[in-house]
Amino acid sequence: MAATINGEGLTVVEYTAELARYKSAQKALNKDVSDTDAGKAVLEDLIAQILLAQGAKAAGHEISGSALQSRLDALTAQLGGADKLTQWESGHGYTDASFRMDLERSIDAAWMRDKIINAVPATADQVHVQQILLYNANEAQNVLQQLKGGADFNTLAAQYDPNARGDLGWFPKGYLLDPHVEQAAFSLQVGQISDVIQTNVGYDILKVLERDPGHPLSPDAYLAMQEQALRNWISQQRAQANIVLAP
């Protein structure tokens, strides 16, 4: 076994075949991935898939044999017949039995994934923020002093960003790439101005324009929240799971 996850085995044959498929896909994308990185990525993906499939079973999901066969029949027809399916399986490192098992697991995992992401609410606590982004620490401190002296934030924001006037729009927690900016934004009161925040991009000064505990998520933010929910679920399950890796 390459690993066991809560007593369910991940065979070396299955792992090796998936690794070969992964490397082939990366090569087709002209991506150079080391054997070590490829092995880690494949193992993590397989463990996540098994945990999701186990979660589906625990939640009461069960695909019937007839439904699974219908999926196989549809795929067989799509490929052009049973011989074509056998050729495809062979070319991708599958046997009939291993492909059937992998398909069932994939269906279970997809069901659980949909259950997790569909449970994410379409609204969230969000702030509407305006920023002044600068690339020099001294200039940032100078602008902050102007603001403290009564200068208009919107006027200064327009000076440094004539098009968008520094408007970041609405966003929830967990959406921004920089946690320092997000933490500062959610710690401010409406109308309050932050100190200078150093980021990987430069130096930010923020002003919270509005806050709404139930503001509708934008499509991008909703997708990000769904992805975060899925990552969190897998991380929690992984922490609680009994996972034994082969030496």
Residue ranges and their predicted role:
Residues 29-33, 142-181, 209-216:
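Peptidyl-prolyl cis-trans isomerase
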Residues 232-247:
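Short, low-complexity, Pro/Ser/Thr/Gly-rich segments in the mature regions of secreted, periplasmic
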Residues 110, 114, 118-146, 155, ...:
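Extended amphipathic alpha-helical interaction segments
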Residues 31-32, 58-65, 155-159, 194-197, ...:
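Surface-exposed patches in mature extracellular/periplasmic domains of secreted proteins
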Residues 1-24, 51, 56, 107-112, ...:
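FKBP-type peptidyl-prolyl cis-trans isomerase
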Residues 2-5, 10, 37, 63, ...:
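Extracytoplasmic
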Residues 90-131, 158-160, 179-219:
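Proteostasis/folding factors centered on peptidyl-prolyl cis-trans isomerases
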Residues 1-97:
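N-terminal targeting/tethering segments
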